[in-house]
Amino acid sequence: CCSVDPAAARRLEKNIAATCGCPYEFIAYDNRINGDGLCKVFNRCAAAARYDMLCFVHEDVEFQTEGWGQIIAAKLAEADCGVIGFAGSILKLKRLTGWHNGGGDLRAHYVQYMRGGHHPIDRNPDGVDFSPVVTLDGMCLFVRREVWSETLFDEQTFPRFHGYDIDFTLAVACRYRNYVCNKVFIEHFSTGGYTREWIRTMKRLHRKWHDRLPMFAMPMPQSEIDRYERISESYFIRFMWQKGCFFERGFGHGMQYIARYPLSGASWILLPKYVVYKLRDILKQKKK
């Protein structure tokens, strides 16, 4: 893991020792001084690791299922298996988004700690042990060494702390099948940061992958792709408002969406959401 909190890294190591259920090596990269980007950190740690199955994990994660190491290892051993994680999407559109599109594309099996509560997130509509996906969130990623070595994390395009997970899992998905694991539960204790840097990185990611997108975990009719395009546009507008990023998606973007889709339920929800999120942002700014 990439560590800026030695106490958190020790808690994670203790948790892994109690739950993994198979031989492992724990590498904590002390990043407090250098502040190296995650692509560089993960490539260095993977190159130094002794085993052939790798886990790139945030230090603010807790494994809650005993024996998870054997469950993951058995799936990774399949020749066509790429990356395994705990939250992902069945498609990645050309339209600017994060790692999912705000609709039925989400596949997830983890607990998110936020606002003082533990919130289980379980999206497994097919009822399978491992859900095929294209992209994965980077809180915890498992991959075979040979798959990592064919792809590597892109240190040049993503030198900081965003985009590495989507880029890496898209690259692996070009040759292998990625999965969300529904047999192991983990808890994630942070929700990520959505800033101007995050937005710039997502735009850089989309420029890099423009000629390959959209990508799908399974064949999808054009009508379904068009539906996700509409859903994801509305979702991203609301998401940017929720995170206070009105500089990226403002009131005008919402009005343009409503003008194009006046009868859509997604349109009707935009105005009240804008009022709520804008007022919250104003109050937050006043407290500073």
What are these regions (language model features)?
Residues 1, 5-20:
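Short, well-formed alpha-helical segments that are part of the catalytic scaffolds
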Residues 33-49:
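Glycine-rich, basic loop-to-helix element that forms the pyrophosphate-binding segment
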Residues 54:
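Short aromatic/hydrophobic "clamp" motif used to bind/position activated sugar donors
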Residues 62, 66-107:
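Conserved donor NDP-sugar-binding/catalytic core segment of glycosyltransferases
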Residues 119-143:
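A recurrent flexible, glycine/aromatic-enriched loop bordering the glycosyltransferase active site
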Residues 135-136, 145, 149-171, 178-187:
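Donor nucleotide-sugar recognition loop
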Residues 175, 179-225:
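Active-site donor/metal-binding and catalytic loop motifs
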Residues 200-203, 224-288:
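Non-catalytic, C-terminal membrane-associated alpha-helical segments of glycosyltransferases
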